[in-house]
Amino acid sequence: MKKQLKRTKKHDKKDWKQSICAKCKGLCCKYITVDIEEPKDDEDLDNIRWYLIHDGISILVEDERWMVKVDARCKHLQADYQCAVYNRRPEACKQYDTENCDYRTVSENLPKAYREFEEYGRLRRYVKGRWAKAHRGRKKKR
C-alpha cells in the first residue's frame, strides 16, 4: 500500500507538488457521500427515488456499499485547488485514501470502483436485476 502524503506546517512543498493531489483540481472536495441501506423492496426503492428527483444527487453502489452522492463544493477549496484549512481539516479529509481517488481513476483510465446512477429508471433496472439474481441463487440452494 502506498504511503499517503500528509501535509503539515513542516511540509516539504516539493514533495506535495509531485503528489497526485497537486495534479488534481479538488475532485474529492466537490461532493460528499452519505451511506444508505441497500433497498430490500419497492418501498425502499421508492425512497431512493426521492433522492434522485433533486438536482446534484446521484446514487453510488460499490460492491455492497450504497451511498447518496451530493454535489457540493467544500467552502474551503481555494481557487488553486488547495485547502484553506489544511492543518485544521476534518478527520474525514485526513483519512481520505488517494489509492482509489477520482483523479487517479480518470488520469490512469481505470474503471471506477463504483456504479453511479443519476436517473431512477437505470437504478431501478439495476436493482431489479440484483433481486432476480439473488432470487435465482436462493432457488438453486434448495
Regions found by a protein language model. Give the residues of each.
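Short loop/turn segments that flank or connect secondary-structure elements
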Residues: 1-142
